[in-house]
A protein has these predicted regions:
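Short secondary-structure junctions
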Residues: 36-44, 79, 181-189
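Acidic/histidine-rich catalytic neighborhood of metal-dependent amide-processing enzymes
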Residues: 71-73, 85-170, 176, 184-199
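Catalytic-core environment of secreted peptidases
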Residues: 49-93
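Generic non-transmembrane alpha-helical segments
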Residues: 9, 32-33, 174-183, 236-248
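A non-catalytic alpha/beta surface segment that caps or lines the substrate-entry region
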Residues: 8-58
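Functional cleft and adjacent loop/helix regions within the main domain
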Residues: 189-232
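His/Asp/Glu-rich mid-to-C-terminal helical/loop segments that flank catalytic regions of hydrolases
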Residues: 103-104, 215-250
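Conserved beta-strand scaffold positions in the cores of enzyme catalytic domains, especially
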Residues: 41, 113, 143, 207-209
Length: 250
């Protein structure tokens, strides 16, 4: 399955009331896609799904956190001319690229994946993930938050690096070096809009946000625009930088 096909499949409704999911369409798609994969659901909270490979080989992990809640009244994904996609993509864009990496086994065994709710309000999904992993005595050595952004669109970047919080000098250096050696265009925004990274940082977890650039109002029912050819590059960015972090901190 191509990433664009996954994107169309996961651009469906998912809502919560800050305490639990109330609309679960996207959850059902994710669970179905991963049912025959190398991943198992190791944690199900009221506002999160936590996946890991079978079994979790290390009590020290790199976490990827991608929120699945949305604010739209209607959801859609359409392909326009010149390789432009239009749709309600906050946050199905990063969900789809992450799922592709999981389905094609591009992530290391000690990478744990969390799909979270309530990001649009209080990030209670991310907070629940931290509580659940802590109860299992699993240490989050580094966290990558995935989200969409208005940064980097004019520069035609397929990804951005934002909100680096609590990242030690050596790990940060290795990530930026990997980005430069890769050669894909990107922008770095140290102090960006608030997202789940702020909540992980409050628990002293080193983190950054890896964002997918879009154009337009990301919360509009009319949708926003993004470049289709960025899908495989963003997907590769997730796999590439999580591997760098794993080598640096585990």
């Amino acid at each position: 399955m191509e990433i664009a096909d996954i994107l169309k499949a996961v651009t469906v409704d998912c809502k919560d009331n800050r305490r639990e999911f109330t609309v679960r369409n996207r959850i059902e798609v994710i669970e179905s896609m991963l049912s025959n994969s190398s991943y198992q659901l190791v944690g199900r909270g009221k506002l999160c799904l936590i996946y890991a490979k079978k079994p979790i080989d290390n009590k020290k992990v790199v976490l990827i956190s991608s929120h699945i809640d949305c604010v739209y009244d209607r959801l859609f994904c359409e392909e326009q001319e010149n390789g432009i996609l239009c749709g309600t993509f906050d946050n199905s864009l990063t969900n789809s690229c992450l799922l592709y990496d999981m389905l094609t086994d591009k992530l290391d065994d000690n990478v744990v994946v969390a799909f979270t709710g309530d990001e649009e309000e209080d990030s209670n999904g991310a907070k629940e993930v931290m509580r659940m992993l802590r109860r299992q005595h699993i240490q989050i050595a580094f966290c990558f938050v995935l989200d969409v952004t208005e940064e980097g669109w004019k520069e035609k970047c397929p990804y951005t690096i934002e909100n680096d919080l609590g990242v030690d000098m050596e790990t940060g250096y290795e990530i930026i070096r990997a980005a430069k050696e890769w050669g894909q265009r990107y922008v770095f925004v140290h102090d960006a809009e608030p997202d789940e990274s702020w909540d992980y940082d409050e628990e002293d977890i080193p983190c950054l946000t890896l964002c997918y650039p879009i154009y337009g109002d990301m919360h509009s029912n009319e949708g926003c625009l993004t470049r289709k050819n960025s899908l495989p590059i963003y997907s590769e960015a997730i796999a590439r930088f999580t591997k760098v972090a794993t080598n640096a901190v585990i």
